[in-house]
């Protein structure tokens, strides 16, 4: 594979004319993908909001497909995988857990413990992980998702890994920095790291109020890091006037606006997102939306969407087409048969709809 020809094809697949920084990043990605087999090489792409990271990734995936090169898309959560797939032209995307772990059998399933690693049977594949800043180095069971991901990818012949994220996003719980986006951490795991950062705003996003304020907050974060101890850094002020994608809403109008968003036939519940400053406020808004907008007064109701928080392996008969329930999957409640309290906890007997495998 000629890296210059490959880079030209990626740039052609972009829906706009790339800026100089994007051209340089595409050239680096092309060299990475076109290089002859080398042991354990990883590419880390850090992209600020609005810099064209999503479009660039989609163009890369389409170019790999056109060249008959296998691209495997993954993300930490079901929602992130769904968005990643949509932004990549409908190319299938998996949660990391679903791809790199396998179904446990017999005593292994009954014993629980760390998940069972799957076998990477791919050859010459490029694994692309979006939202990589969410990947933690260690969970409550002492399992490192990052270590397991790396081991899985590089157990396949001539497979390589591209990690895509934004270091300004919150790191995994218990971490000060995202280990997956930290070249020093990756080198400590024995990887040869190539890294690039997109900082220039794409022209088509320059008029976005969301992007404007995200950039302002990013600069404020840099000031906080550079402020000497004992001094108070300036508090950033958000700008809301003059943007088509930012609207100030009075509290009394919020229920009507939320109802309109959730009733939207095209987007609906799945794509309506409310961001709060704390988990407590999130719980309050969730309760209010369920009761006053969706009219769901029960603790758990038909249509509720749930996020799986831990891998589950079936010890008996498996549902058709489902090997195991993966951490990060989004499932939908189809029927609630009953609830009960045991050992100080509440349990529900429900029927769930699972995402396609």
Q: Each PLM stretch: what is its role?
A:
Residues 10-29:
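N-terminal pre-Walker A segment at the start of P-loop NTPase domains
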Residues 14-15, 73, 297, 322:
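Short basic coil micro-motifs at the edges of alpha-helical modules that engage polyanionic partners
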């Amino acid at each position: 594979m000629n890296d210059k020809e490959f880079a030209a094809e990626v740039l052609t697949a972009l829906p706009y004319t790339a800026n100089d920084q994007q051209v340089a990043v595409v050239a680096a990605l092309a060299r990475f993908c076109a290089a002859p087999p080398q042991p354990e090489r990883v590419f880390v792409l850090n992209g600020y909001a609005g810099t064209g990271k999503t479009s660039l990734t989609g163009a890369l995936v389409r170019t790999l497909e056109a060249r008959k090169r296998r691209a495997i898309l993954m993300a930490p959560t079901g929602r992130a995988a769904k968005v990643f797939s949509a932004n990549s032209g409908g190319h299938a995307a998996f949660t990391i857990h679903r791809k790199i772990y396998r179904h446990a059998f017999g005593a292994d399933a009954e014993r629980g413990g760390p998940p069972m690693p799957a076998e990477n049977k791919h050859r010459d594949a490029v694994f692309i992980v979006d939202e990589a800043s969410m990947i933690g180095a260690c969970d409550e069971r002492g399992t490192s998702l990052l270590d397991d991901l790396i081991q899985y990818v590089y157990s396949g012949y001539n497979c390589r890994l591209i990690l895509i994220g934004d270091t300004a996003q919150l790191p995994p719980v218990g971490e000060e920095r995202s280990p997956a986006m930290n070249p020093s951490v990756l080198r400590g795991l024995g990887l040869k790291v190539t890294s690039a950062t997109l900082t220039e705003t794409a022209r088509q996003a320059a008029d976005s109020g969301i992007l404007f304020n995200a950039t302002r907050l990013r600069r404020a974060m840099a000031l906080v890091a550079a402020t000497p101890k004992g001094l108070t850094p300036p508090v950033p002020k958000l700008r809301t006037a003059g943007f088509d994608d930012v609207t100030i809403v009075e509290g009394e109008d919020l229920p009507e606006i939320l109802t309109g968003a959730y009733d939207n036939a095209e987007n609906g519940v799945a794509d309506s997102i409310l961001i709060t400053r704390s988990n407590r406020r999130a719980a309050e808004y969730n309760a209010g939306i369920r009761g006053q907008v969706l009219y769901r007064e029960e603790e758990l109701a038909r249509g509720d969407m749930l996020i799986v928080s831990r891998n589950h392996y079936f010890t008996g008969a498996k549902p058709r087409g489902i090997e195991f329930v993966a951490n990060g999957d989004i499932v939908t409640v189809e029927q609630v048969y009953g609830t009960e309290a045991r050992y100080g906890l509440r349990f529900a007997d429900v029927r769930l709809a699972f995402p396609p495998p």
